[in-house]
Amino acid sequence: SINSVGGVILPNLLKALGVEYKFINGEANGEFAHNPEPIEKNLGGIMGELANGGYDLGIVVDPDVDRLAFICEDGKMFGEEYTLVSVADYVLSNTPGNTVSNLSSTRALRDVTVNHGGVYTPAAVGEVNVTTKMKDVHAVIGGEGNGGVIYPESHYGRDALVGIALFLSNLAHKGCSISELRATYPEYCIAKNRIDLTPSTDVDAILVKVKEMYGKEKDVTVTDIDGVKLDFPNKWVHLRKSNTEPI
């Protein structure tokens, strides 16, 4: 819970779910023990703890408890992109329906949705864009590939607590280890890179050029609701301007 509010509420949730746990950086004092973003490069401590054995899984949340990541029993990352995939798998198995995630998220959610007979719809990056699209298509589950789970039955907002409950329910229902659960989902690799440009760079012109270059290709689907996304048969590229960071 990286020394933030998660340390206040997570013990109550885990106890209610019958989970035995050990807290790392659980004191809610606001003094982060490391970079609080729940991604692999920041989680060496808890990954090492898991690798030493004796645990079924690791749970990591960010300071405001809206991003959620899991670590397998062997100390390897479950994958932040796959938090939503696993939760959606469980929700769709009980409540058939549609799903939504942002354009920069893994294709695995689409695959799982189709397997359950639903329809996957992409949205522009940003929680408000995802929730708006979820309402439009009456999605039963959605979110973002950074570990953000949005479950309308609870509320229209990213919520790691809801994600934990649904993920653990899926794990219990499947009756397998977390690494075995991970192996049941399509394996996609994803790289998220930031490109720092000079202020004089005309990013919009670049995006228009990319769209023009690939728009006539038969095997490429171009989406321009948020930058430009190019979907090839076995890969994709998404280029966009950040709304939260200078470029």
Predicted feature residues:
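Short hydrophobic/aromatic-enriched beta-strand-loop microsegments
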Residues: 18-25, 77-82, 117-125
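Short, acidic/small-residue loops that bind anionic groups at enzyme active sites
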Residues: 77-94, 98, 124-126
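Short Gly/Thr/Asp-enriched flexible loops that form oxyanion-binding sites at enzyme active sites
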Residues: 9-11, 66-84, 110
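Rossmann-like NAD(P)H-binding beta-loop-alpha module
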Residues: 1-16
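Catalytic-loop motifs flanking and including active-site residues across diverse enzymes
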Residues: 6, 80-87, 105, 160-163
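Short acidic-glycine loop/turn motifs at beta-strand connectors
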Residues: 62-63, 72-74, 232-234, 243
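N-terminal small/polar loop signature for handling phosphorylated ligands or for N-terminal nucleophile
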Residues: 12-71
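Phosphate-binding and adjacent anionic-ligand microenvironments
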Residues: 57, 95-247
